Amino acid sequence: MRRLSLNLLTLSLTALILGALTVPAIAVHNRLVRTPSLPIPTTRAFAVYLDPWHIDDWAANVGAQPTMAAKFEAFSRKRTVEHFTSEAERRGIRSVLISWEPWKPVKTRLGIFKQSYPQPGYRNIDIARGSQDTYIRRFAGQLATFHGTVYLRYAHEMNGFWYPWSWDARDYRRAWRHMVHIFRDVGASNVRFVWSVNPNLYERAKPWLENAKRYWPGAAYVDDVGSTVINFGGPKIYAADRFAARLRDLHRLYRLPLILTEVNTQYGGRVRWLRGLRSMLQKMPEVKAVAWSQLPSRGAAQMNRADDMHWDVQKDPASRAVVRDIVEDGLRTTPETSQSRNAAPVQPRR
């Protein structure tokens, strides 16, 4: 009887412990920390890869005000980002998108293979083991001071072969989780982590998705799913709606809001392509942000043949009218699908 009583007591204690473990929380190092909720926007943000100082000029030229500023930032530069976030805040911008690249940038002219070669200190395994902890911690602290939402697009397009962080999906996942743990430890609760792939439309859908899944760090470490949407022309000329199937695959799989993290098109046929993009977006309320990028493209520079990407929407009346419509469409409340509601990445995580 005594043994039976002890067994019952053990079972009761086990049930209590397991029940406690179901309370939403995050394991950060050796302690549990709750993640504050960030609201999912019911409008679609529009970002421009520009310094905040030039956002107003862009808005005046295009006739629509971006709601988000975006930039690329490489680990090797070890720069402060407070000037970027503080200027955005001063100009009334409450969201920023940062494409955060764990490497020392390689000159484009050296080619893809040189660019993709692993760099000591910046390799996924090095980051997972703490090689960049001091920098990551400082960067997280700077972003935590921003009175708005930071969309952090870490180590993007990992499912390609042109960046050094594409090597070893397992170590990529480890590096990502380690980075997120540091941000949570610092208390940067205003940061949303954006896992952003390349659509690789030259691949068949199933192997493309299976390859991308290898890099997935886990639902507890991702808030939004992103994808590049660039029509280079030449051998890579794709209508906007060609990207839709890839985006829907990602949304069905992960049930998270989508962000088009880099959007651009060749000069030839640009108006038709942009109209197609607008039509696609009107059918996809799960897309919560679009980031317009007309920065010099490594992809265009390193392709055997790409059409003209060196044009500026600010100076092109025909295309800027469509871009203006896309921006204004997003300012209207977007209908939330049941999938989007169920996909809320703002729920506390385990």
Regions of interest found by a model, annotated:
Residues V28-R77, P345:
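Boundary/entry segment of secreted carbohydrate-active catalytic domains
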Residues R34, L38-P52, T261-R349:
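Substrate-binding cleft of secreted/luminal carbohydrate-active enzymes
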Residues D57-A64, T80-I98, P105, F139-H147, ...:
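Acidic (Asp/Glu)-rich catalytic clusters
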Residues A64-A74, A212-Y238, S293-L295:
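Aromatic- and acid-rich polysaccharide-binding/catalytic face
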Residues T80-W195, W292-S293, M309-Q314, V323, ...:
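Substrate-binding cleft of extracellular glycoside hydrolase catalytic domains
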Residues F84-E101, Y221, S227-G269:
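Glycoside hydrolase catalytic-domain groove-lining segments
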Residues L201-A220, R270-L277:
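Distinct, well-ordered alpha-helical segments
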